Amino acid sequence: AVERPRQDGQVHEPPGRERKAGCKNFFWKTFTSC
C-alpha cells in the first residue's frame, strides 16, 4: 500500500479520512496526487 494508483488508493485506505486530506496525505504518503 505504498505505490498504488489513485483508484486503488481509496481502497486500501478508508475514504473517510483520506478523502479530506487525501490530496495532501496521498501526495507525500504515496505518489498519488489529486
UniProtKB/Swiss-Prot annotation:
Q: What is its main location?
A: secreted
UniProt GO cellular component terms: extracellular space
- Which pairs of positions does the record mark as disulfide bonds? 23-34
- Source organism, top-level taxon: Eukaryota
Q: Where in the cell is it found?
A: Secreted
The annotated region (Disordered) lies at: 1-20
Q: Which InterPro entries match?
A: Somatostatin, Somatostatin/Cortistatin_C
Gene Ontology BP annotations? regulation of cell migration
**Key words, A-Z:** Cleavage on pair of basic residues, Disulfide bond, Hormone, Secreted
Gene Ontology MF term list: hormone activity
Q: Does the keyword Secreted apply?
A: yes
Function (record text): Somatostatin inhibits the release of somatotropin.
Q: Which family does it belong to?
A: Belongs to the somatostatin family.
Protein's name according to its UniProt entry = Somatostatin
Q: Which gene encodes it?
A: sst
